[in-house]
Each structure stands twice: as structure tokens, then as C-alpha cells.
Amino acid sequence: MEDRFLKRLRKKARRGMRGWPLATVAFYGPNLSRASKVAVGIFTRENGDMEEIRDWKLDTGDVRTDPGIAREILEFMEAHGVLSVTMTDRIIGCPHQEGIDYEGEWCPVCDFWRGRDRFTGQIVQ
């Protein structure tokens, strides 16, 4: 049975736009099958900059199915009074950040993503 925190998070995302603040939930991983990182950004108004961002990572397992991470994400959203949630339906790239974790165009750790479009996973180069 699906954990209640995971269920609540998915339900919030399905509800659509309910007002501001808005939370964005994006999943990242070493490939298209395992999400090792989730990042949540908070926007307080339309066309505004992201006010805060937080991420969660796992060395093993998948962040999309971890009830503890789902609970912490919900608590983070509640602390910011989030009314709307948008969530990616797939992994959208490498969990490492260009310019922070590595220099250059492609992550040296995640060979899978080399030459791939981060949103589709399709090879572009």
C-alpha cells in the first residue's frame, strides 16, 4: 500500500493551480529509471524569482518512493504556506549541478546523460 505522505504529495500535484505560493518538484537521477535526487523550489508570486530551494538525495533507492522524503517535502511546503504544486512526471537530468559539482557541459559521473536531452532522455549529440 502506498504511504500516506507519498499519496498526499501526488494528490497536491494533481490538483493544479490553487494560488500562490507555488512549489515545483523536480526529480533527477543517474539514468531514467532511478531518481536519486528531488529538488523543491518555492515561488511566492507569478513571474517572481524562486524564493527558496531545498533538495533531498539518496545513495541507494529512489526518492520518488521514499515515504520519509515525501513527509519532509510536505513539511517544507507547509512551512512556506504552499497552495499549488507542480511536479515532473519523469527524471529530468543528472543529479549533479553544472558549475557546482562539475565544470563543462557534461557531468563526468553520469555517463548516461552525456549527449542526451535532459527533458526527454533522447540522444541529441
Question: Can you name each region flagged by the protein language model?
Answer:
Residues 1-77:
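Long, charged N-terminal interaction/targeting segments
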Residues 75-125:
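Cys/His-clustered metal-coordination modules, chiefly Zn-binding fingers
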